[in-house]
């Protein structure tokens, strides 16, 4: 199976998600992008798209926005796309009803070297605790948060000049660098997962 034969549905919302969205679009058959609905923001109440929706529009990708993740018609829509993997980056927790849809599983990119800083705000915790390094982890999603089998990890140095923005950018790019090898590892070497 070549990479372009691997069907991906991507779930994400933030700027942190975008490098991996591009990597998935460049390397795989990206069937759809699921993101939150556009919202009115600021004083002028302008309608703003999520960063993921903005990029998906620029790339002319199929967008599914603002859905109830447990809605039967949404679930059927995902099944009809015949995904091999879900790739989830900076999105909400997927309900159990979705986890069985992709043929091989759902992969999350988390911005820490799991199990350290499991859960919310891992970048902030690494900075507050003055760590000298952190990293990203790819793992298979299980019903309990950040507990699935780890596929791969990449360590990133934290410099004295790093702040949330700079470290988040480094980690988002590192996650994008891992996604292709992580998917191929799941397909061909699943017995090696941690």
Regions found by a protein language model. Give the residues of each.
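N-terminal Rossmann-like dinucleotide-binding module
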Residues: 1-44
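Donor/substrate-binding cores of folate-linked one-carbon enzymes
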Residues: 26, 85-194
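N-terminal beta-loop-helix "entrance" segment that forms/cooperates
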Residues: 39-59
């Amino acid at each position: 199976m070549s990479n372009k034969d691997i069907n991906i549905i991507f779930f994400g919302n933030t700027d942190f998600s975008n490098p991996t969205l591009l990597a998935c679009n460049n390397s795989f058959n990206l069937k759809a992008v699921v993101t939150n609905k556009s919202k009115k923001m600021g004083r002028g109440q302008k309608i703003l798209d999520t960063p993921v929706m903005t990029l998906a529009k620029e790339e002319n990708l199929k967008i599914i926005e603002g859905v109830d993740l447990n809605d039967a018609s949404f679930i059927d829509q995902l099944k009809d796309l015949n995904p091999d993997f879900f790739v989830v980056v900076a999105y909400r927790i997927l309900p159990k009803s979705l986890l069985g849809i992709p043929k091989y599983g759902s992969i999350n990119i988390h911005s820490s070297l799991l199990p350290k800083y499991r859960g919310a705000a891992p970048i902030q915790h690494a900075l507050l605790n003055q760590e000298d390094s952190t990293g990203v982890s790819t793992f298979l999603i299980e019903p309990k948060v950040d507990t699935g089998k780890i596929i791969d990890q990449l360590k990133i140095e934290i410099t004295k000049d790093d702040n949330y923005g700079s470290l988040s950018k480094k980690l988002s790019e590192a996650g994008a660098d891992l996604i292709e090898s992580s998917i191929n590892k799941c397909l061909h070497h699943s017995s090696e997962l941690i």
